[in-house]
Amino acid sequence: MVELTLSEQTWLKEYYPELSYDSSNHKLYGKVSFSLRYEDLPVNKGSYDFDVDFSLMKGRSDFPCVYNTDHRIIDAAKRKRKPLADFHIDSDGKLCMILPCKMPQFYTNGFNIQEFMTHLCNHLYWVSHYDLYDKEPWPGEKHGNEALIEYVKDYRNINLIVNDKKQLELFRVLFNKKYGKGIALNKLKNRLLTDESLFKELINWK
Protein backbone atom coordinates (compact mmCIF):
# COMPACT_ATOMS: atom_id res chain seq x y z
CA MET A 1 0.00 0.00 0.00
CA VAL A 2 0.94 3.67 -0.29
CA GLU A 3 0.81 6.07 2.65
CA LEU A 4 0.36 9.78 2.10
CA THR A 5 3.25 11.84 3.41
CA LEU A 6 2.74 14.44 6.12
CA SER A 7 3.21 17.20 3.54
CA GLU A 8 0.54 15.62 1.33
CA GLN A 9 -1.85 15.39 4.28
CA THR A 10 -1.18 19.02 5.20
CA TRP A 11 -1.78 20.10 1.61
CA LEU A 12 -5.09 18.22 1.52
CA LYS A 13 -6.30 19.88 4.73
CA GLU A 14 -5.57 23.29 3.24
CA TYR A 15 -7.03 22.82 -0.24
CA TYR A 16 -9.63 20.05 0.24
CA PRO A 17 -10.87 20.44 3.84
CA GLU A 18 -13.96 18.28 3.18
CA LEU A 19 -11.73 15.23 2.69
CA SER A 20 -10.42 13.07 5.53
CA TYR A 21 -7.45 10.72 5.45
CA ASP A 22 -7.67 7.41 7.32
CA SER A 23 -4.05 6.34 7.70
CA SER A 24 -4.93 3.00 9.33
CA ASN A 25 -7.04 1.88 6.36
CA HIS A 26 -5.05 3.84 3.76
CA LYS A 27 -8.13 5.64 2.46
CA LEU A 28 -9.14 9.17 1.61
CA TYR A 29 -12.85 9.90 1.85
CA GLY A 30 -15.32 12.75 1.80
CA LYS A 31 -16.52 15.42 -0.59
CA VAL A 32 -14.60 16.80 -3.57
CA SER A 33 -15.85 20.24 -4.64
CA PHE A 34 -14.71 22.03 -7.77
CA SER A 35 -15.32 25.17 -9.80
CA LEU A 36 -13.61 24.98 -13.18
CA ARG A 37 -13.75 26.38 -16.65
CA TYR A 38 -12.30 24.98 -19.87
CA GLU A 39 -11.46 27.44 -22.66
CA ASP A 40 -14.62 29.40 -23.54
CA LEU A 41 -17.04 26.84 -22.09
CA PRO A 42 -19.24 27.69 -19.08
CA VAL A 43 -17.93 27.45 -15.54
CA ASN A 44 -18.96 24.19 -13.91
CA LYS A 45 -19.38 23.88 -10.16
CA GLY A 46 -20.13 20.68 -8.34
CA SER A 47 -19.33 18.28 -5.55
CA TYR A 48 -19.17 14.50 -5.36
CA ASP A 49 -18.53 12.07 -2.51
CA PHE A 50 -15.56 9.74 -2.87
CA ASP A 51 -13.53 6.97 -1.33
CA VAL A 52 -9.95 6.80 -2.60
CA ASP A 53 -8.34 3.49 -1.67
CA PHE A 54 -4.53 3.39 -1.60
CA SER A 55 -4.31 -0.07 0.01
CA LEU A 56 -3.86 -2.02 -3.23
CA MET A 57 -1.10 0.22 -4.57
CA LYS A 58 2.26 -1.57 -4.51
CA GLY A 59 4.09 1.70 -4.97
CA ARG A 60 3.80 5.17 -6.46
CA SER A 61 3.91 3.81 -9.99
CA ASP A 62 0.39 2.46 -9.34
CA PHE A 63 -2.95 4.29 -9.26
CA PRO A 64 -5.48 4.16 -6.41
CA CYS A 65 -9.02 2.82 -6.67
CA VAL A 66 -11.44 5.77 -6.79
CA TYR A 67 -15.12 5.23 -5.96
CA ASN A 68 -18.00 7.69 -6.28
CA THR A 69 -19.88 6.86 -3.07
CA ASP A 70 -22.94 9.09 -3.53
CA HIS A 71 -23.60 7.35 -6.88
CA ARG A 72 -24.20 10.65 -8.66
CA ILE A 73 -22.27 9.60 -11.74
CA ILE A 74 -24.06 6.25 -12.11
CA ASP A 75 -27.39 8.01 -11.50
CA ALA A 76 -26.56 10.49 -14.28
CA ALA A 77 -25.84 7.66 -16.71
CA LYS A 78 -29.12 5.96 -15.82
CA ARG A 79 -31.06 9.21 -16.13
CA LYS A 80 -29.57 9.82 -19.57
CA ARG A 81 -30.04 6.14 -20.50
CA LYS A 82 -26.41 5.96 -21.53
CA PRO A 83 -23.84 3.20 -20.95
CA LEU A 84 -21.78 3.61 -17.79
CA ALA A 85 -18.67 3.58 -19.98
CA ASP A 86 -19.81 6.89 -21.51
CA PHE A 87 -19.39 8.39 -18.03
CA HIS A 88 -16.11 6.55 -17.41
CA ILE A 89 -17.38 4.60 -14.42
CA ASP A 90 -17.89 0.91 -13.62
CA SER A 91 -21.01 -0.67 -12.11
CA ASP A 92 -19.38 -0.77 -8.65
CA GLY A 93 -18.87 3.00 -8.71
CA LYS A 94 -15.17 2.82 -9.53
CA LEU A 95 -13.98 5.60 -11.83
CA CYS A 96 -12.08 4.78 -15.00
CA MET A 97 -9.53 7.58 -14.89
CA ILE A 98 -6.35 6.20 -16.44
CA LEU A 99 -4.89 3.13 -18.10
CA PRO A 100 -2.21 1.68 -15.80
CA CYS A 101 0.26 1.70 -18.69
CA LYS A 102 -0.21 5.48 -19.02
CA MET A 103 0.94 6.23 -15.47
CA PRO A 104 4.52 7.13 -16.52
CA GLN A 105 3.11 9.49 -19.15
CA PHE A 106 0.88 11.49 -16.80
CA TYR A 107 2.67 11.00 -13.47
CA THR A 108 6.26 11.37 -14.59
CA ASN A 109 7.63 11.35 -11.04
CA GLY A 110 5.17 8.80 -9.71
CA PHE A 111 1.87 9.28 -7.95
CA ASN A 112 1.46 12.39 -5.80
CA ILE A 113 -1.68 13.79 -4.23
CA GLN A 114 -1.47 17.26 -5.81
CA GLU A 115 -1.42 15.96 -9.39
CA PHE A 116 -4.03 13.37 -8.51
CA MET A 117 -6.51 15.95 -7.19
CA THR A 118 -6.05 18.07 -10.31
CA HIS A 119 -6.61 14.94 -12.40
CA LEU A 120 -9.73 14.02 -10.40
CA CYS A 121 -11.25 17.51 -10.58
CA ASN A 122 -10.65 17.68 -14.33
CA HIS A 123 -12.31 14.29 -14.63
CA LEU A 124 -15.31 15.54 -12.65
CA TYR A 125 -15.53 18.67 -14.78
CA TRP A 126 -15.68 16.44 -17.89
CA VAL A 127 -18.39 14.22 -16.38
CA SER A 128 -20.41 17.19 -15.14
CA HIS A 129 -20.24 18.99 -18.49
CA TYR A 130 -21.24 15.82 -20.35
CA ASP A 131 -24.20 15.38 -17.99
CA LEU A 132 -25.37 18.99 -18.35
CA TYR A 133 -24.89 19.53 -22.08
CA ASP A 134 -24.74 16.02 -23.63
CA LYS A 135 -21.41 17.01 -25.18
CA GLU A 136 -17.82 16.22 -24.32
CA PRO A 137 -15.86 19.36 -23.32
CA TRP A 138 -12.84 17.68 -24.94
CA PRO A 139 -12.43 14.23 -26.53
CA GLY A 140 -12.72 11.66 -23.77
CA GLU A 141 -10.41 8.71 -23.32
CA LYS A 142 -11.54 5.37 -24.68
CA HIS A 143 -12.77 2.85 -22.11
CA GLY A 144 -11.48 -0.60 -21.17
CA ASN A 145 -10.03 -2.81 -23.90
CA GLU A 146 -10.78 -0.20 -26.55
CA ALA A 147 -8.53 2.26 -24.69
CA LEU A 148 -5.75 -0.31 -24.40
CA ILE A 149 -5.89 -1.11 -28.12
CA GLU A 150 -5.79 2.61 -29.01
CA TYR A 151 -2.80 3.13 -26.72
CA VAL A 152 -0.79 0.16 -28.00
CA LYS A 153 -1.45 1.00 -31.67
CA ASP A 154 -0.01 4.51 -31.28
CA TYR A 155 3.72 4.45 -32.12
CA ARG A 156 4.20 7.67 -30.16
CA ASN A 157 3.90 5.50 -27.05
CA ILE A 158 6.69 3.15 -28.13
CA ASN A 159 9.15 4.23 -25.40
CA LEU A 160 6.59 3.48 -22.70
CA ILE A 161 5.55 0.22 -24.37
CA VAL A 162 9.03 -1.29 -24.72
CA ASN A 163 9.93 -0.37 -21.14
CA ASP A 164 6.90 -2.24 -19.81
CA LYS A 165 7.84 -5.92 -19.65
CA LYS A 166 4.25 -7.18 -19.94
CA GLN A 167 3.57 -5.11 -23.05
CA LEU A 168 6.89 -6.07 -24.60
CA GLU A 169 6.07 -9.74 -23.94
CA LEU A 170 2.84 -9.30 -25.92
CA PHE A 171 4.84 -8.03 -28.88
CA ARG A 172 7.18 -11.01 -28.57
CA VAL A 173 4.18 -13.35 -28.77
CA LEU A 174 3.06 -11.56 -31.96
CA PHE A 175 6.60 -11.75 -33.36
CA ASN A 176 6.84 -15.48 -32.63
CA LYS A 177 3.49 -16.17 -34.29
CA LYS A 178 4.23 -14.06 -37.35
CA TYR A 179 7.79 -15.24 -38.00
CA GLY A 180 7.67 -18.69 -36.42
CA LYS A 181 10.76 -18.10 -34.30
CA GLY A 182 11.69 -16.60 -30.97
CA ILE A 183 13.55 -13.39 -30.23
CA ALA A 184 15.26 -12.05 -27.11
CA LEU A 185 13.36 -9.25 -25.39
CA ASN A 186 16.31 -6.82 -25.57
CA LYS A 187 16.72 -7.46 -29.29
CA LEU A 188 13.00 -7.01 -29.90
CA LYS A 189 13.04 -3.80 -27.86
CA ASN A 190 15.85 -2.33 -29.97
CA ARG A 191 14.18 -3.34 -33.23
CA LEU A 192 10.85 -1.81 -32.22
CA LEU A 193 12.56 1.44 -31.21
CA THR A 194 14.34 1.75 -34.55
CA ASP A 195 11.88 0.16 -36.97
CA GLU A 196 8.35 1.57 -36.99
CA SER A 197 7.44 -0.72 -39.90
CA LEU A 198 8.02 -3.81 -37.71
CA PHE A 199 5.81 -2.27 -35.03
CA LYS A 200 3.01 -1.73 -37.56
CA GLU A 201 3.42 -5.24 -38.99
CA LEU A 202 3.00 -6.81 -35.57
CA ILE A 203 0.11 -4.55 -34.54
CA ASN A 204 -1.82 -5.32 -37.73
CA TRP A 205 -0.92 -9.01 -37.96
CA LYS A 206 -3.81 -11.47 -37.54
What is each PLM-predicted segment?
Residues M1-L12:
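Extreme N-terminal tail/first-helix region
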Residues D70-K206:
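Domain-scale recognition of soluble eukaryotic interaction modules
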